[in-house]
Regions:
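N-terminal active-site segment of His-dependent metallophosphoesterases
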Residues: 1-54, 62-71, 75-79
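Active-site glycine-centered loops adjacent to acidic/histidine catalytic or metal-binding residues
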Residues: 14, 38, 59, 86, ...
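Surface-exposed beta-strand edges and their flanking turn/coil or helix-capping segments
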Residues: 24-26, 69, 88, 96-99
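Short, surface-exposed loop/turn motifs that are enriched in glycine and acidic residues
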Residues: 34, 87-88
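Conserved beta-sheet core of the metallophosphoesterase superfamily
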Residues: 55, 90-116
């Protein structure tokens, strides 16, 4: 029987340009950080990258064309397929666009923000 390896992943969203130094304590030892958008300022990502590699999607306050970040990201960790985006719901409803994307991608896990 193959032994499973546990990987810790830090998940964050909606930082809006703010970086709480406590993140360094919370994310100590993570293998990767997923940021689900509304980053706000590039230095937030730069500081997170000092902790672990970062995969990020742009949010509605992050002009995604200027940020260079995609609106949606799919990554794989072994057999786990992770979908990362910012806006999945609007007014308590899954958006039609998001529903199509999720139906097409069939992720195991979906990480999103914009829920505040």
């Amino acid at each position: 029987m193959k032994r499973r390896r546990t990987i810790r992943i830090g998940v964050i969203a909606d930082t809006h340009g703010l970086y709480d130094p406590a993140i360094e304590r919370w994310f100590a030892g993570v293998a990767q950080i997923l940021h689900a958008g509304d980053i706000g300022r590039r230095d937030v990502i730069q500081r997170l990258r000092k902790i672990a590699p970062v995969v990020a999607a742009s949010g509605n306050i992050d002009d995604y064309e200027k940020s260079g970040l995609p609106r949606r990201v799919i990554i794989r960790r072994g057999k786990i397929k992770i979908a990362i985006c910012h806006v999945l719901y609007e007014k308590g409803q899954l958006t039609k666009d998001a529903e199509k994307w999720l139906d097409r991608e069939q992720p195991t896990v979906c990480v999103f923000g914009h829920s505040h």
